[in-house]
């Protein structure tokens, strides 16, 4: 299969993202291209992916509007019916606190969340246990290729 042809845009709406991750645009583009080459079997071979790096307030609004949950979350995906694929929004504060609490590197955790969102755009989900195992396996394999430890083996610290 030919590699996926993707148009990838990255918008930074919260300055802390750039301060903590200076190479984010290059890294995110590489991450999505790697993921597409590895996981695109069931999804479109080309499309537009927009990544918005924002804050908890924005993710809380999106989560309330689209999922009926009045709280922030780490990542949301928005499939686009007009263009193949869609958008991914990631909340800085939530990702930062999760990474700290789970003793993960911030950039590694942020990459995992973006990858997770991208796999949702490709049609993967984790509602059913079997599908969750498949999605986690793909995430783990791609992250391992990028030199990032399996995020599911890292234990959360007690609160």
For each feature predicted by the language model, list its residue ranges.
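An acidic/histidine-cluster motif and surrounding catalytic segment
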Residues: 1-111, 122-159
